[in-house]
Amino acid sequence: TAAQNLQVTTSGTLDNSGGSMSAATLKANAVSLKNANGTISASTVSVTAPQFDNSGGKITANEINVSATNLTNHNGALTQLGSGAMGVNVSGTLDNSGGGLIQTNSTDLTLAPSTLNNNGGTITHAGTGTLTIDSGSGTGSLTNVSGKIVTNGLANLTAGSMDDTGGTISGQTGLNAT
């Protein structure tokens, strides 16, 4: 049974590998969060961890907010069901390769890591607003080799280098790539 609210704060590693955390509102603050093959579900999920490993993990919520320096999401899933803003604030490397999935119903979605690796991964934006990917403020790299980046709205992609070999990037209402 899900707790009303769950807040976990540690100055070390929070390890939910293979585990399950569920609550109405879930807040996790740690130096490192490991959710490898774990499950996190709540109406609202908020994660703050400089190092966040969600490899094989599943995070599902109406609202998701992630703040990390580096996020590894190999074969993991971040699924936001609600239409509110989804926060995936990664300042370093966002590695969604190897079957990673980021999907949201939010009106807009902005991803602004210094490096985005979506090789073999999927980023799906069901909102009708704008999907913005800004790798390194226009100087970073975006790789989407055999990956999929799609939006029902407008796609704006900015990167210093971009590789979409065998990949798909599409925007229902338009696509801008620089």
Segments predicted by a language model, with ranges:
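Short, T/G/N/S-enriched strand-turn elements that build extracellular solenoid repeat scaffolds
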Residues: T1, L14-M21, K34-I40, D53-T60, ...
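Well-ordered beta-strand segments characteristic of repetitive beta-sheet solenoids
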Residues: Q4-G12, A24-V31, S43-P50, N62-L71, ...
